[in-house]
UniProtKB/Swiss-Prot annotation:
Expressed by the venom duct. The cysteine framework is I (CC-C-C). Alpha4/7 pattern. GO terms for molecular function: acetylcholine receptor inhibitor activity; ion channel regulator activity; toxin activity. The modification Glycine amide is found at residue 66. GO terms for cellular component: extracellular region; host cell postsynaptic membrane. It is found in: Secreted. Disulfide bonds join 51-57, 52-65. Keywords: Acetylcholine receptor inhibiting toxin, Amidation, Disulfide bond, Gamma-carboxyglutamic acid, Hydroxylation, Ion channel impairing toxin, Neurotoxin, Postsynaptic neurotoxin, Secreted, Signal, Toxin. Alpha-conotoxins act on postsynaptic membranes, they bind to the nicotinic acetylcholine receptors (nAChR) and thus inhibit them. Has weak blocking effects on muscle nAChR composed of alpha-1/beta-1/gamma/delta subunits and the central nervous system nAChR composed of alpha-4/beta-2 subunits. Does not detectably affect the peripheral nervous system nAChR composed of alpha-3/beta-4 subunits. This is Alpha-conotoxin SrIA/SrIB. PROSITE patterns: ALPHA_CONOTOXIN. It holds the Pfam family Toxin_8. Residues 1-21 form the signal peptide.
Length: 69
């Protein structure tokens, strides 16, 4: 193969890798959003349980435990 042909093959490989990487990142990002939502929900639930089990915290943040101010 000549130098020009090798350079063309190199460019095609780089382009193909870029396209595959870009589409994989988009799919990965949407999965990350769902995972981050689950983690946020778990953190909120843990904080709520911890706070509601302590009287001083429950009085300070009644909206977490279903109470009103």
């Amino acid at each position: 193969m000549g130098m020009r042909m090798m350079f063309t093959v190199f460019l095609l490989v780089v382009l193909a890798t870029t396209v595959v990487s870009f589409t994989s990142d988009s799919a990965f990002d949407s999965r990350n959003v769902a995972a981050n939502d689950k983690v946020s929900d778990m953190i909120a639930l843990t904080a709520r349980r911890t706070c509601c089990s302590r009287p001083t915290c429950r009085m300070e943040y009644p909206e977490l435990c279903g109470g009103r101010r």
